[in-house]
Amino acid sequence: MNTKELWIEVKEILSRDESVSPEIYNYYISDTNLYTVSDNNCLITTKSEIAIGVFEAGLNEKIKNILKKLTGIQYNISFELEKNINKQASVISKIDTLTENNNLAYYENYTFENFVRGDSNHEAMQAALAVALDLGKKWNPLFIYGDSGLGKTHLLHAIENKVNEIYKTNNRVKYLKADEFGKIAMDILNQGHEIIEAFKTSYDIYDCLLIDDIQLLAKRNKTNELFFHIFNSYIEKNKQIVITSDKYPDDLGGFEARIISRFSYGLSIGLDSPDFETALKILEQKLKHQNNLGLFSEESLEFIALNFNSDVRKLEGAIKRLLFLAVMNKKPNEIITLADVEKAFKNAPLQNNEKITPKKIKQIVADSYNITIKAMMSKSRVSNVMQARQLAMYFCRTLLDEPFTRIGTEFGGKDHTTVMNSVKKVEAHISTNKEFKHLVNAIRRKIEGR
């Protein structure tokens, strides 16, 4: 039984109810409609405010009982004037028109199953999956940050696709690029008060709102005011919001402090550049999907994974260049070798051209902490100097895989135990302090030349 059929049945029962006079039925019930049914909530539209008063005064419980008898579900009932719904529908239509390209079949492949997991993105993927499986109950809002090309948009659409799969509908989730939201908001702000108010509630029909690249709304105060209203409404109603950005919330400029505070209210989690193993898996998956995996030697893929792993788009760009050159210069099905790859990129700025050394690590860490290498190499127990020294030792261990004794020698004759304890302290701090983890990842990218 669909919504229309259900409401016809409800009205039929009310028309036969002796406690409902013909006048009440004809004046207030006959022209009502059941507008939406979502979870345990029903929204009924009427043509007059008097009708809403009549329903709330004497018919609310009666309708609940009829609905429960017909469906077995105990519904909460709310009422709205039909004219307000029509305004809201007009706004929703405008939103759908401006964002219709966001729902192309292209994004159907952006699923959790197709998301290549690694140390750089595992936590973000797990958090995104958790909110998709239990909207509004786990982390709200979920704020995913990271540089362009690391998989933020993929995760948003993976949430969308998972929710659609669970609920067998495409109407519970709304994906919006932040700049598109800005365009819609600017158009709405140039219209009357009633349209603005309708816009504020137009997203109430969704249970999950996905906003991509929120940094694009920076310094747009009036637009941010509208977004803040919608954001707060979602949080208060336990509806899920997921936001992506190229920066950690506290590093975003152009937003009021209260908005930044709200962004940080739930869970903020970062995406880092893929490590070598993850980059290699991404390459293999994409080439397999294109039926091109057999065209590349293992060594050629390893070269690409090592030198173009700052983000997924650079990996894809390298592959496209090689496939183009293969079409132009090689026989059909001839393997692309390491020599081919090195020749193709002989003039390209490769990430690993500059060798990482203990000296380079010390300099970049010292610069990041605004101290000198001399201070780092001293016996100073000042907090930031100690942390910089420990972090430099940590990078020598994790990026160069140097023995503890050799690292100790690099740092003025520190013994094996001191170095090992320093590395453990950094690892423990990373696991318990997300801001420190954010700093460590930023310094690592500088060291690796990304």
Swiss-Prot record:
Keyword DNA-binding found: yes
Lineage of producing organism: Bacteria, Bacillati, Mycoplasmatota, Mollicutes, Entomoplasmatales
Region (Domain III, AAA+ region): 105-326
SUPFAM superfamilies: P-loop containing nucleoside triphosphate hydrolases, TrpR-like
Gene Ontology molecular function: ATP binding; ATP hydrolysis activity; DNA replication origin binding; lipid binding
CC annotations in GO: cytoplasm; plasma membrane
Region (Domain IV, binds dsDNA): 327-450
Stored Gene3D superfamilies: 1.10.1750.10, 1.10.8.60, 3.30.300.180, P-loop containing nucleotide triphosphate hydrolases
Family: Belongs to the DnaA family.
Disulphide-bridged cysteine pairs: none
Protein name: Chromosomal replication initiator protein DnaA
This protein's domain notes: Domain I is involved in oligomerization and binding regulators, domain II is flexibile and of varying length in different bacteria, domain III forms the AAA+ region, while domain IV binds dsDNA.
Entry's localization field: Cytoplasm
PROSITE patterns: DNAA
Keyword vocabulary terms for this entry: ATP-binding, Cytoplasm, DNA replication, DNA-binding, Lipid-binding, Nucleotide-binding
Binding site for ATP: 149, 151-153
Superkingdom: Bacteria
Transmembrane segments: none
Region (Domain I, interacts with DnaA modulators), start-end ranges: 1-73
Assembly, per entry: Oligomerizes as a right-handed, spiral filament on DNA at oriC.
Gene: dnaA
Entry-linked Pfam families: Bac_DnaA, Bac_DnaA_C
Region of interest: Domain II: 73-104
CDD domains referenced in this protein's UniProt entry, alphabetically: AAA, Bac_DnaA_C
SMART domains associated with the record: AAA, Bac_DnaA_C
Function recorded in the entry: Plays an essential role in the initiation and regulation of chromosomal replication. ATP-DnaA binds to the origin of replication (oriC) to initiate formation of the DNA replication initiation complex once per cell cycle. Binds the DnaA box (a 9 base pair repeat at the origin) and separates the double-stranded (ds)DNA. Forms a right-handed helical filament on oriC DNA; dsDNA binds to the exterior of the filament while single-stranded (ss)DNA is stabiized in the filament's interior.
Swiss-Prot/TrEMBL GO biological process terms: DNA replication initiation; regulation of DNA replication
